[in-house]
């Protein structure tokens, strides 16, 4: 696209979305804000800004992709449609890893606040957002509840919140990332879900001897979630890497256990045959006496497994939400970050499929358990 062609298209889209700027409904405001982010990022890339991040490639951060998506959304608005209906995010942002917790009949979701058109290492993911809903469709956005902090293990970025309630306290386990991208599991607590205090003893979990962790280089220890079993034992699951018997490293699920939510015992790390690239965003729950693990199988989508033991013995049940259509432009562009939960008597599963150009939204689908212990995904809530 030549410079003159670009600015003709840029001006055309801005003129066409102008009438929608006076609309006050959330769907229109969200879509217009997304269009603005797409065309403005395309403008900087077209002017010569480096589209990649600190670690290289930036799949989808091309003028053609960014402008193409903006054109699609603009045309939909003109046709009286909401192109992002059923896909929640704060206007102008991406919603990535997330965690649900119910309180007083309302559902709270906590999430990474990402940036459209920018990789995480270009415009930092350094705040955790918060929204509340009574129906899982209409969300009331709250103030961000946690941020990166100078001098701590999260002095660069904060990722992947996982919230769990126990004995009057809400525990948020999140990934603290330092400037070298050495990742650690950190903790913040709250009694009301709005005011959070970081634990002074952070970090609370690092990989065991089966892996490696170095403060001065990239080290995998992220995407934690905590499940409290019937006997009161809390189990933490997180994305990491372990030594292979024949040398080198492989992606793995790290597990730790605790009785007090602060002190954690290493329970090892486990690999999965079905996961051929990277395992991310684990989520564990108990159903009918069995333990179910849902996780992102990068390059493919959301997979799940079952076990009689909360630590090991996981047996694959296959893919649950697969990437459809064209193959993903990069392994991260798949349905991911799933959580399964029951709300007001109905089961649901969440997903946040990353689009080329770092668009990412929260989607919630109906979810059904079957008598044989398997599950299936139904229609999306809109």
What are these regions (language model features)?
Residues 2-56, 60, 69:
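Amphipathic, heptad-repeat alpha-helical segments
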Residues 61-382:
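Carbohydrate-active catalytic/glycan-binding domains of CAZyme proteins
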């Amino acid at each position: 696209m030549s410079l003159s062609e670009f600015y003709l298209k840029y001006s055309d889209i801005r003129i066409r979305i102008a009438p929608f700027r006076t609309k006050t409904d959330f769907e229109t405001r969200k879509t217009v804000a997304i269009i603005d982010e797409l065309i403005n990022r395309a403008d900087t890339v077209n002017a010569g800004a480096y589209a990649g991040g600190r670690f290289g490639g930036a799949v989808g951060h091309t003028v053609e992709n960014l402008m193409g998506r903006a054109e699609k959304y603009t045309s939909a608005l003109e046709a009286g449609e909401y192109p992002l209906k059923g896909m929640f995010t704060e206007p102008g942002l991406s919603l990535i890893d997330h965690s649900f917790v119910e309180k007083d009949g309302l559902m709270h979701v906590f999430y990474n606040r990402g940036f459209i058109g920018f990789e995480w290492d270009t415009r930092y993911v350094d705040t955790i957002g918060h929204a509340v809903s009574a129906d899982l469709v209409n969300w009331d956005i709250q103030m961000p509840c946690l941020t990166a902090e100078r001098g701590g293990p999260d002095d660069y970025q904060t990722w992947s919140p996982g919230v769990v309630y126990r004995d009057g306290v809400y525990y948020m386990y999140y990934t603290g990332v330092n400037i070298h991208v050495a990742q650690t599991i950190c903790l913040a607590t709250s009694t009301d879900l709005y005011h959070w205090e970081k634990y002074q003893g952070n970090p609370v979990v690092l990989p065991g001897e089966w892996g490696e962790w170095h403060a001065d280089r990239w080290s995998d220890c992220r995407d934690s979630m905590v499940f409290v079993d019937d006997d009161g034992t809390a189990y933490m699951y997180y994305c990491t890497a372990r030594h292979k018997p024949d040398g080198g490293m492989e992606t793995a699920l790290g597990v730790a256990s605790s009785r007090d939510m602060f002190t954690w015992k290493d329970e090892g790390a486990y690999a999965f045959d079905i996961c051929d690239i990277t395992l991310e965003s684990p989520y564990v729950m108990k159903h009918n006496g069995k333990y179910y693990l849902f996780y992102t199988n990068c390059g493919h989508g959301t997979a799940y497994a079952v076990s009689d033991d909360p630590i090991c013995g996981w047996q694959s049940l296959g893919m649950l939400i697969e990437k459809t259509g064209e193959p993903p432009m990069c392994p991260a562009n798949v349905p991911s970050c799933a959580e399964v939960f029951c709300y007001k008597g109905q089961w649901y599963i969440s997903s946040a499929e990353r689009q080329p150009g770092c668009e990412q939204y929260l989607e919630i689908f109906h979810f059904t358990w079957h008598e044989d212990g398997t599950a299936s995904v139904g229609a999306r809530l809109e």
